[in-house]
Amino acid sequence: MKLGYKLLFGACVAANLVATSCVDDMKFGNSFLEKAPGGSATIDTVFGSVIYTQQFLNSIYGRQYYGLPYKDDTSLPVSSSPYCGKIEALTDCWQLHWRDAQLYTQYYSGIHTANYGRRQDKFCYNDEKVWEVVRWCWLLLENIDRVPNLDENEKARMIAEAKCLMAVRYFDMFRHYGGLPLLTASFEGNESSYECPRATVEETVNFMIKLLDEAINSGALPWAYGVGDDADGSSTYVGRWTMAGAMALKCKIWQFAASPLFNDNQGYAGGASEAEQQHLVWYGGYRQELWDNCLKACEDFMRELQARGFYELNHSVNTTPAGYRYAYRMGYLYQGSKEVLHSVRVQMGDAFNSSTYFWHNW
């Protein structure tokens, strides 16, 4: 089974870099996604400056998956729109306070099918900015050696961060679709073909784990950002990928891969579909070694945690139910919580009646 690269290429073309006439007015975010006038001048501009390269990496961070619907904007993952909703709202994690979110109307009414439109799926294949992030990360990896006066330690860290960003965005989609096309370079726009076979579940998992292993083993990522234990002391960098975050994501990937969703004696949908026959949505049988891999990844993390410290559970000030409940809430509510292994943050602004529709307005 093959998936045409046309969808991927269409998404990636929209992410071309743009050069500006004023060096101090480099545009990122929405403006940064405008179509470039042509040639490689835009790449030369971005990777001709340490500051611009840092800003480019920052723009990639801005397309991570965020747990709350916070803005309806086509430059952001479509699940960021309150109109769409979040997959977590179908679990016991939390609820949407607007009953007409597409996630609710499609699933709870039992009318969800593969023929969905924009905002109607729990995780859209080509509108979650996954492929844009993958392309941007490859652009950074392919061009970072060109950046003049970039400190070697910072360069190594940025490379490791880009690999983590690719891995986490692949995982965001993997848990919904299974095997995915594996992109190993950026596109220039003049390739003769954009067709690529969809990888198996096993190949996709190995691809994500390889990216994380390279980031972890590079030694370029600090264990934590903040003050205390083995943290680097820079609280302004909180939210960037760390060694702890990368190791934790590795545990999560193996856990999903080993779960009955992908790892069982029979395919989730019975085993007769084309996707199941080609092992695109499961491993093709039960494998105990997947749980062994998950266990080892967890043991590796706990061993590092014991040696390095910093992260810990919040403790109740007393033994009452209210005390434990408060400690639990502060674990995810408090911005400086040491329970958080990787923090994804957004910073937006909306005026009254601006139609940007923040989650707090619903």
PLM regions: where:
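Short edge-strand/loop segments of extracellular domains
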Residues: 186-190
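Short, flexible active-site-proximal loops enriched in glycine and acidic residues
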Residues: 177-183
